[in-house]
Every structure is written in structure tokens, then in C-alpha cells.
């Protein structure tokens, strides 16, 4: 599948295009890029790589959790492009993205995210189906209750995590790769209906 992936859930936004066996990526300082310029940045990204929207058949969009304005703007643009260009739209959240390479590998997986100085955790089963609601937790609770649980944290998030958490047992640091989203899609693990931002308090 040829696709565009948009992730503006964090301060560093990213765009990714896969066309056949070629991939193209770009990072943007999303907290310093006006949201009304996002559409232009996407079109410039295609143009820089001699591509057009006609080259893709779908869009993957990060629903969060994360930056409120970034999520809202990127989701609105993704929906607009999907409708105007008749492209399939697939939504994903940051919790399952961290687990993309663990399908059928662990009975229980705890995906950890830190957002606005708060820790959040979501449990998945071996089929990567959410076993629980998103739970807000603390450093001490994670250390006390999840030391022996199999946990995943994105490598680029480690700078935000307390060192005590990063030293816990069974902590798996993962790279977030846009191409893994196609794997999630092929296994029916992306949202296709009611795609909306995932906000955390």
C-alpha cells in the first residue's frame, strides 16, 4: 500500500511517505510551526520528492495522545485530503504504535507514555487488543506495580522518563517506525471509523 503517515502528537512532528519500495520522511518542529501552514508543508514534502497525492491510496494519522492543536490540525487535514482525493483514512494511537512489533510475542504488554509531566499506561493482550482503559499513574506506582511486567517505551521518549523507571526489569525500548503502521493495518488494528483525537487530562 502506498501511503502518507502524519504524526503531530509531539513537539517534533513527522511526515512519512511510502511509495512501492521507497520511503521518504521529514521532521518538523510542530510547536513552532503554525498549524495553518501544515497543509503547505505536506504539499511541499510531496513536491520535494517529485511525488503527488495521486501516488498514494491511504493516509495514516496519529490520534494521540499529545499536543492538542497539533492533533486537531493534522486530523482535520487528513480527513480533508481523504475526502477530496478519495483516500482511505486509518487512525492509530501512540500506545499501540509502541507495540507494533510485539504481535503474538507476549501475553501482556504495558505501553507507557509520559505527557505533560504525567505517566499513562495501557495494557494490551498478545493480539494487541486493549485489555484496559488508559490509566494515569505515577513514578512510584510504576516502580511498585509494574517492575516485573513487560513494558514498552519509545526510545525517543526516554529523555522524559525518570531514571528509576528506565532501570526496571522487562523494559523494552522501541523505535517508532511509520512503516510498522502498515503491519498494524494488515492485522486489522487501526481505526477506520469515528477517527478522532485521543486527549488526556
Q: At which residue positions do the language-model features occur?
A:
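Oxyanion-binding and handling regions
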Residues: 1-18, 90-201
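DPxDG-like acidic metal-binding loop motif
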Residues: 58-94
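Buried hydrophobic packing segments
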Residues: 42, 77-81, 99
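Short, basic/glycine-rich phosphate-binding loops at helix/coil junctions
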Residues: 20-23, 75-82, 119-120
Amino acid at each position: 500500500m502506498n501511503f502518507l503517515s502524519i504524526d503531530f502528537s509531539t513537539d517534533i512532528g513527522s511526515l512519512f511517505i511510502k511509495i512501492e519500495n521507497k520511503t521518504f520522511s521529514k521532521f518538523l518542529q510542530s510547536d513552532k510551526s503554525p498549524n495553518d501552514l501544515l497543509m503547505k508543508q505536506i504539499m511541499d514534502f510531496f513536491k520535494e520528492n517529485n511525488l503527488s497525492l495521486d501516488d498514494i491510496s491511504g493516509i495514516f494519522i496519529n490520534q494521540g495522545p499529545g499536543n492538542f492543536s497539533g492533533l486537531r490540525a493534522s486530523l482535520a487535514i487528513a480527513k480533508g485530503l481523504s475526502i477530496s482525493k478519495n483516500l482511505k483514512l486509518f487512525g492509530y494511537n501512540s500506545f499501540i504504535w509502541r507495540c507494533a512489533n510485539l504481535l503474538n510475542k507476549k501475553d501482556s504488554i504495558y505501553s507507557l507514555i509520559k505527557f505533560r509531566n504525567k505517566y499513562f499506561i495501557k495494557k494490551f493482550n498478545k493480539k494487541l487488543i486493549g485489555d484496559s482503559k488508559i490509566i494515569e499513574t505515577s513514578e512510584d506506582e510504576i516502580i511498585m506495580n509494574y517492575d516485573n511486567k513487560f513494558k514498552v517505551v519509545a526510545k525517543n521518549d526516554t529523555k522524559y522518563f525518570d531514571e528509576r523507571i528506565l532501570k526496571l526489569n522487562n523494559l523494552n525500548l522501541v523505535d517508532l517506525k511509520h512503516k510498522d503502521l502498515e503491519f498494524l493495518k494488515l492485522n486489522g488494528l487501526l481505526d477506520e471509523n469515528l477517527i478522532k483525537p485521543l486527549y488526556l487530562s
